[in-house]
Amino acid sequence: MISKKVDTQVVIIGSGPSGYSAAFRCSDLGLNVVLIEQYYSLGGVCLNVGCIPSKYLLHIAKVIKDVKKLSRIGISFEKLDINLKEIQCNQKKIIESFSSGISNLARKRNVRIIFGYAKFLDANSIFVQGEHDSYVVSFNKIVIATGSLSKKLSYIPYDDIRIWNSSFAVSIPSIPKKLLIIGGGIIGLEMATIYSALGSNVDIIDNSHDILPHLDRDVIDIFKRSVNHDYNIFFNSNVIKIVQEKNGLLVHIAENDNKNKRFELYDIILVAIGRVPNTDMLDISKVGLKTDNNGFIKVNEQFCTNIPNIYAIGDVIGQPMLAHKGTHEGHIVAEVISGKKHYFNPFVIPCVSYTEPEIAWVGITENEARKNNINYEVSSVLWNTLGRAVSSQCSEGVTKLIFDKKTNKIIGGCIVGSNAGELLGEISLAIEMGCDAEDLALTIHAHPTLYESINLSAQIFQGTITDLINKKIKK
């Protein structure tokens, strides 16, 4: 079969948030663009098996949890009735709607889409194998935005249909009676939130000493108390062996010191131990692209690799693996390719664990401030002091801000609570714009709201708080 010849200025490999953002911005800047995607549904992991479908399920989980809370105040409903097919159908409609939207945007921008697997021939051409046709695409510049894949463990029998990864789990193939999640990171916690709400008995096993160990323990302790009755988390533990039985998967679990060992039978095991770069099929060694020890492509502040006309963005270049970071990188790399002197230099990148309650953070943590010998001060407001939180049955939360005592500027913040991710934007903007505590304290916030906790935290630092005891007033 003779390959079709295609010549273009810019090629983007991957149609996730990083890839399509780069493609569309390049087109808007007047460049001729070809977008390569291996699957027929555009949007990458985020849209198809990640961010969007999981948030749909997490919304369902939140509603279920909120309904159960109403029994505390005299309102109860009949037994929960879950129509799994209807849930799956609605999820599919959401994905198709957004994927179709991306296709329409590409068409209106004259971005050509080629479906197939790409691999490098040399630094200025790739081979793309589609379902029916193959292509040799020549280009001036290329952007690798192929994303990431679920990391695998060598001792896991992945050929067993009872072993899931997060991409499969988000499709809700079934609701297991007993579910083991290996990995207590954000993905593991979100999956536990979903399946426990739907009725599964969920255990999480993680080999670290605590969940999200880079965050401050005071805020994480509030989260753990809130989910204490939803699922079990076993720290400092590892899965040693999995035995495939007819009636389930027999898991040999041991603590890190190997002193305490036990066997547990599970219906399903979900492996969520992190992600690895999706580069194996690209044949990047042919062009000599440099990677780090974990296989992530090395880039500079303009996302250029060691090959001058080859760029990389998104998950494929490493942590933090966040769609919104990738989108921003897509915009920057397009500006660079078009000849502008743009660089990736954000002060902060917000992060959210979309559990219930949510955990959202940005900037420096207290632990980091201490390690870096920053003269800082913490200012926190517990949500059980917020009228909106108490009246909305979501009082298990906290808003914690970190201020630099020399400049009074806000340098970090963490929120645990319902819709914490939606509240984080003000803190992110405040850090990015160099706001100090007075800026936040003197900005009138609506009452009663959850976001006024940011204002109150700033008032505590300023020593002007009236809604709580002012510990800075000397009598």
UniProtKB/Swiss-Prot annotation:
EC number: 1.8.1.4
Keyword field contains Oxidoreductase: yes
Disulfide cysteine pairs (residue numbers): 46-51
Signal peptide: none
Cofactor binding comment, as recorded: Binds 1 FAD per subunit.
GO molecular function terms listed in the Swiss-Prot or TrEMBL record: dihydrolipoyl dehydrogenase (NADH) activity; flavin adenine dinucleotide binding
Source species, domain of life: Bacteria
Compartments in which it is found: Cytoplasm
Entry protein name: Dihydrolipoyl dehydrogenase
Gene name in the database record: lpdA
